[in-house]
């Protein structure tokens, strides 16, 4: 059994014999059932550093969204020396480490695609070093180049026509959460020893392709671990051994995360589930009199400050899909252990308290793992923070725990992954609304007039027949699912080949479980359109070529979002049918297929590429985001809308079901305390039905309109809203996306 002096005072055996952070947590954490009265406000150092950073953020916004960009140095673990928020005030920083050499400066990351890295620079007025272009076009192939060399004509056509879109073929796929806690608990040298053992035992003497690839990957992981040590040494820290105290635990853990964001520009670079783990160190130091509560809070404030600073260089087409500069540094608090004990600690409060000490912020993507069994005081405090900041999302721990255990992280917006045991292949989304139009028009795209899907017989007749439409849709969805999975298989293969996440995978078990994520866009529009065809009279309007370009819908029909089983049953059918078709296909590296109903802000882009629908949505209008009902469809209030979404089975959408709701403050109560109490009651009822996710916004439409018209007002500098799966500063959205948010339902009654 291994023993380090840094482990003095910790209980347990298994975690000492193998890399097992969960066992360490279960044997050592102390649940906290009290309220927030113990919390400390910001220290002088926190206020000063946050003030400096806010000034830099204002300069960044004034320069069009980018403060500075690298043009000569390729990002890597040791590409830069030490960097600080302020060189003059670096002694104030309790947690150190920047992606580059300056705060908010964006790194040059060409391995996902040299063209994209160069375009990101030029879009903001920076000219990349031509030598980098030569190197990455003549000598070092990139992920993007590999993908487009292998794409079939059919894949390219489907991508161009945006029936599958948002694909991670021009940027890092992300959604891989390294178990950054391992750096703090074990130190790098022990982790290297364990990976070296894995390398020695990889293969049984027959060098198959899988064995050869795995041996190469483990070797890359060991190299990355050594690079982490060198990176930390530049800041004067030796992370070869375990962390000895709370400050080192926070710093060591952050160095693990910093290694990930220095080497990958994934769409989601989640932090993971760290609050309870770090609380163990906090409690030990507090008991020994080594720190005060103010110092404990300062450590968390400074760590969160670093998460708020994460930036990547992006191209305009990426920003259109994922608006507002998100990085999904998702961080979880709360949850209940499989033994029934609450996993809420004082540290869970401290992380939420950063939204008070430093104000609202989209990052880290703060996520409460919700259960009706959470301590009442914690539920009330989280709800209060939601009412005050609209910066928190909630996910149902009671439906996720049976699948992922009690040590999972949220690896993107809403997707769970078992920490240190699993990885996810990110797969963007298929536009099922567009697929329905393909079914009606025999595979012809109404926007481009190209034959994209199979040339099946178009749906005929003066009035659409439900059974005929369903049969045609089933065939077209089958084609789309096959093409979608094949395209993703190709992308994931090339990402492993040219842009492997060595730093993150070094902090995950070698024998890793892989999930294969897919996604659905246009969900509610398909449901309502099929409902209209079934329960009303839908007459297709054809142009001179016979192509259906619009619809005349007569009569009432049930809409998803009103707790009406006639519509909601169609929604359940659609989700199950799509997953069934995905699961029939071969998936890369024996990964387990999952799907999601999640669109981010890409619903605007998807909508532009989608024609008119039978539900009344016109061509080019935004699609409704995630699993939300169509705009204007909700007629029976907030609770009815939530009840509809709750009927969607989580086990059919393990990649997540995103639901975003905006509630007028007056609808929740007369004051913040009453609003928090009522919000808890709403969430208890919603999640007890088996619902998966809820974004909560508490403000009125008039505030959004004022922020759009007067972004210069100080009160809107950090005005944060929840959108499909993440949070964003409202003034960082494009006007088109702001108008889309304003158009969404704001509930004035429960």
Segment roles from a protein language model:
Residues 2-750:
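Conserved catalytic cores of very large enzyme subunits
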């Amino acid at each position: 059994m291994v023993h380090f002096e840094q482990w003095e005072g910790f209980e347990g055996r298994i975690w000492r014999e193998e890399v097992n952070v969960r066992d360490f947590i279960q044997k050592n954490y102390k649940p906290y059932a009290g309220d927030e009265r113990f919390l400390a406000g910001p220290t002088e150092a926190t206020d000063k550093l946050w003030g400096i950073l806010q000034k830099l953020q204002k300069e960044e916004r004034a320069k069009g969204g980018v403060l500075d960009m690298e043009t000569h140095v390729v990002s890597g673990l040791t590409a830069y020396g030490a960097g600080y928020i302020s060189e003059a005030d670096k002694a104030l920083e309790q947690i150190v480490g920047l992606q580059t050499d300056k705060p908010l400066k964006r790194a040059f990351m060409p391995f996902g695609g040299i063209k994209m890295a160069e375009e990101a620079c030029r879009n903001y007025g920076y000219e990349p070093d031509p030598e980098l272009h030569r190197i990455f076009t003549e000598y070092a192939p990139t992920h993007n180049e590999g993908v487009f060399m292998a794409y079939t004509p059919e894949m390219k056509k489907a991508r161009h026509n945006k029936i599958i879109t948002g694909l991670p073929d021009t940027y890092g796929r992300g959604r891989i959460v390294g178990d950054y806690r391992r750096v703090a608990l074990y130190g790098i040298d022990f982790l290297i020893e364990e990976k070296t053992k894995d390398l020695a035992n990889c293969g049984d003497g027959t060098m198959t392709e899988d064995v050869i690839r795995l041996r190469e990957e483990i070797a890359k992981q060991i190299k990355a671990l050594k690079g982490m040590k060198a990176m930390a040494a530049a800041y004067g820290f030796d992370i070869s051994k375990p962390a000895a105290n709370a400050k080192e635990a926070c710093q060591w853990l952050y160095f693990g995360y910093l290694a990930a964001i220095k080497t990958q520009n994934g769409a989601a670079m989640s932090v993971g589930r760290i609050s309870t783990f770090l609380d163990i160190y906090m409690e030990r130091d507090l008991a020994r009199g080594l720190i005060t509560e103010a110092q404990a809070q300062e450590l968390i404030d400074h760590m969160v400050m670093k998460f708020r600073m994460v930036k990547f260089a992006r191209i305009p087409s990426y920003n259109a899909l994922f608006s507002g500069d998100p990085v999904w540094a998702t961080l979880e608090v709360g949850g209940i252990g499989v033994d029934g004990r609450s996993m809420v600690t004082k540290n869970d409060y401290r992380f939420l308290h950063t939204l008070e000490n430093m104000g609202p912020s989209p990052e880290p993507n703060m996520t409460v793992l919700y259960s009706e069994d959470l301590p009442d005081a914690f539920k009330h405090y989280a709800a209060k923070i939601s009412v005050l900041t609209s910066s928190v999302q909630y996910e149902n721990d009671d439906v996720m725990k049976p699948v992922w255990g009690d040590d999972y992280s949220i690896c993107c917006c809403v997707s769970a992954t078992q920490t240190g045991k699993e990885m996810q292949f990110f797969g963007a989304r298929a536009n099922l609304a567009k697929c329905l139009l393909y079914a009606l028009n025999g595979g012809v795209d109404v926007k481009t007039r190209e034959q994209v899907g199979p040339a099946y017989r178009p749906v005929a007749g003066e009035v659409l027949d439900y059974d005929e439409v369903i049969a045609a849709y089933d065939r077209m969805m089958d084609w789309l699912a096959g093409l979608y999975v094949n395209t993703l298989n190709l992308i994931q293969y090339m990402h492993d080949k040219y842009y492997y996440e060595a730093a993150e995978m070094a902090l995950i078990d070698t024998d890793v479980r892989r999930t294969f994520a897919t996604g659905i866009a246009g969900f509610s529009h398909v449901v309502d359109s099929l409902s209209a065809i079934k329960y009303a009279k839908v007459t297709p309007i054809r142009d001179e070529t016979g192509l259906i370009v619009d619809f005349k819908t007569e009569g009432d029909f049930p809409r998803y979002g009103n707790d009406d089983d006639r519509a909601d049953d169609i929604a359940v059918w659609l989700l199950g049918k799509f997953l069934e078709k995905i699961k029939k296909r071969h998936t890369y590296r024996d990964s387990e297929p999952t799907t999601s109903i999640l669109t981010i802000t890409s619903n605007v882009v998807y909508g532009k590429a989608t024609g008119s629908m039978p539900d009344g949505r016109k061509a080019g209008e935004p699609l409704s985001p995630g699993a939300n009902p169509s705009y204007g469809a909700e007629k029976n209030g907030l609770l009815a809308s939530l009840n509809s979404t709750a009927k969607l089975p989580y086990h059919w959408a393990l990649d997540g079901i995103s639901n975003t709701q905006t509630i007028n403050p007056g609808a929740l109560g007369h004051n913040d305390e009453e609003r928090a109490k009522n919000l808890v009651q709403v969430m208890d009822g919603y999640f007890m039905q088996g619902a998966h996710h809820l974004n909560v916004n508490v403000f009125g439409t008039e505030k959004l309109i004022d922020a759009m018209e007067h972004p210069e007002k100080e009160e809107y500098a950090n005005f944060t809203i929840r959108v499909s799966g993440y949070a964003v500063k409202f003034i960082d959205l494009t006007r088109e996306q702001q108008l889309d948010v304003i158009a969404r339902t704001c509930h004035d009654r429960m």
